[in-house]
Amino acid sequence: MLKEAISEIQRGCAEIIDEPRVEKLLKAYFEKGETYTVKAGFDPTAPDLHLGHTVLLQKLAIFQKYGARVQFLIGDFTAQIGDPSGKSATRKILSTEDILENAKSYKEQVFKILDASKTDVVFNSEWLNALGASGMITLTTTFNVARMLERDDFDKRYKSGTSIAISEFLYPLLQGYDSVHLKSDIEVGGTDQKFNLLMGRHLQRSYDVGKEQAVLMVPILEGLDGVQKMSKSLGNYIGVSENPNEIFGKVLSISDELMWRYYELLSTKTLAEIERLKSGVEAGTLHPKKVKEELAIEITARFHSSESAQNAKDEFDRVHSNNQIPTEMDEFSSSEAISITKALVDCNLTPSTSQARRDIKQGAVRINQEKIDDETLSLESGEYILQVGKRKFAKLKVN
């Protein structure tokens, strides 16, 4: 059982620092029933979690299966600074209201994956606000600027003359101090967090906590484009709280090559099962679309239900294979005649009128299933089914 647990925890990890400590904690659980803590921090800088976040969350869920108590840390204090990791400029500071609203949304979403009975949701403002000026000064004496500038992102910005706020130097120290306060045994984070994660080990030594956390780093999941990391701001994401049809359709939109990456990092299938699927596709005995549909059903069911996932597949087949319109879509209304470009924006089918014009020129826009090419078209009184691309539909009533 210990070997199985270690193998499951290692799967998909980009790097593990102090793996012997991880094995020691697991062994103590299996032999003595001793629990241990695994920390992961999330700054609530946006309201929705996406599949990129779930790579880490699924790793936490595996630890819970093997005796861990998860410290799900919401960085409401550190979100006021913004994590500088990988950033080429200082991040915009969020309002307290936005941070609290986003934090509330996180709490509602994480338990689609984590076991609530084995999770402690904590906010780092609780102890960082209490740290005070004196405590903050003590914290800053544990590290120096020369070592801080060893960070690749800081080094590039410093050499290019790009501004680095003093608060950004504080960010890794504050994240590391979270591990001091929580006395975490293990911390899990993305590969872009390595400097911050190691800071936790450093500060646990500096503050004589009596332990140094092991560190597990998981890969950054590529977005739907297969190039850049999944991000809501880039529009290449699949949100945990999106409806079943959206999740299913978005998974099917990824490339065949990216599909295997998603299988490795997001699926609960064993590596042997995934390898059999891959061999079947390479041998021509399995069609890539069928294998992708299997992944789409699994991911959709995880955040909704098996029935919802199957319904999403049926709806997708009906709309895309049989060229029919969806049975359900968002409905909008206009009190007067409206231009097609404004209608597409108002119905949330495109982000801007300029993009709407491009979509029309590219032949991606249909009205009542008929392709249009006139970007000056005005929609008069009546009901319309608007479509952009293969997956975006809306019903518009013009009075």
From Swiss-Prot:
<dbReference type="InterPro" id="IPR024108">
    <property type="entry name" value="Tyr-tRNA-ligase_bac_2"/>
</dbReference>
<feature type="domain" description="S4 RNA-binding">
    <location>
        <begin position="338"/>
        <end position="398"/>
    </location>
</feature>
<comment type="subunit">
    <text>Homodimer.</text>
</comment>
<dbReference type="InterPro" id="IPR002307">
    <property type="entry name" value="Tyr-tRNA-ligase"/>
</dbReference>
<dbReference type="GO" id="GO:0006437">
    <property type="term" value="P:tyrosyl-tRNA aminoacylation"/>
</dbReference>
<feature type="binding site">
    <location>
        <position position="232"/>
    </location>
    <ligand>
        <name>ATP</name>
    </ligand>
</feature>
<dbReference type="Pfam" id="PF22421">
    <property type="entry name" value="SYY_C-terminal"/>
</dbReference>
<dbReference type="GO" id="GO:0004831">
    <property type="term" value="F:tyrosine-tRNA ligase activity"/>
</dbReference>
<dbReference type="InterPro" id="IPR054608">
    <property type="entry name" value="SYY-like_C"/>
</dbReference>
<dbReference type="InterPro" id="IPR001412">
    <property type="entry name" value="aa-tRNA-synth_I_CS"/>
</dbReference>
<keyword id="KW-0030">Aminoacyl-tRNA synthetase</keyword>
<dbReference type="InterPro" id="IPR036986">
    <property type="entry name" value="S4_RNA-bd_sf"/>
</dbReference>
<protein>
    <recommendedName>
        <fullName>Tyrosine--tRNA ligase</fullName>
        <ecNumber>6.1.1.1</ecNumber>
    </recommendedName>
</protein>
<keyword id="KW-0694">RNA-binding</keyword>
<dbReference type="InterPro" id="IPR014729">
    <property type="entry name" value="Rossmann-like_a/b/a_fold"/>
</dbReference>
<feature type="short sequence motif" description="'HIGH' region">
    <location>
        <begin position="44"/>
        <end position="53"/>
    </location>
</feature>
<keyword id="KW-0963">Cytoplasm</keyword>
<dbReference type="GO" id="GO:0005829">
    <property type="term" value="C:cytosol"/>
</dbReference>
<feature type="short sequence motif" description="'KMSKS' region">
    <location>
        <begin position="229"/>
        <end position="233"/>
    </location>
</feature>
<comment type="similarity">
    <text>Belongs to the class-I aminoacyl-tRNA synthetase family. TyrS type 2 subfamily.</text>
</comment>
<dbReference type="InterPro" id="IPR024088">
    <property type="entry name" value="Tyr-tRNA-ligase_bac-type"/>
</dbReference>
<dbReference type="InterPro" id="IPR002305">
    <property type="entry name" value="aa-tRNA-synth_Ic"/>
</dbReference>
<comment type="function">
    <text>Catalyzes the attachment of tyrosine to tRNA(Tyr) in a two-step reaction: tyrosine is first activated by ATP to form Tyr-AMP and then transferred to the acceptor end of tRNA(Tyr).</text>
</comment>
<keyword id="KW-0547">Nucleotide-binding</keyword>
<keyword id="KW-0648">Protein biosynthesis</keyword>
<dbReference type="GO" id="GO:0005524">
    <property type="term" value="F:ATP binding"/>
</dbReference>
<dbReference type="Pfam" id="PF00579">
    <property type="entry name" value="tRNA-synt_1b"/>
</dbReference>
<keyword id="KW-0067">ATP-binding</keyword>
<keyword id="KW-0436">Ligase</keyword>
<dbReference type="GO" id="GO:0003723">
    <property type="term" value="F:RNA binding"/>
</dbReference>
